[in-house]
Amino acid sequence: MLLISKTLFPIPRSAEELWEGTYTLVVAFVLAFLVYSDYLSNLSPFGEILSSPCIST
């Protein structure tokens, strides 16, 4: 379990590693938001509002 957490969230040793970790978290958050909004658009009548043309691919 410790190995998994070190792989997913490595302790940054330099500013470059810290930036890479932040970038990975941001990308993961954006992907999760896109999946979540797509899920909501299939689920709720407000899907047209959530899946705006600038977000949907």
UniProtKB/Swiss-Prot annotation:
Q: What's in the keyword line of the UniProt record?
A: Host membrane, Membrane, Transmembrane, Transmembrane helix
> Whose protein is this, by species?
Human herpesvirus 6B (strain Z29) (HHV-6 variant B)
A GO CC annotation given for this chain: membrane
Say where the protein is mainly found.
host cell
Which named protein is this? Uncharacterized protein U24A
**Which residue spans traverse the membrane?**
21-37
Compartments, record wording: Host membrane
| Domain of life, per lineage | Viruses
- Membrane topology of the entry: Single-pass membrane protein
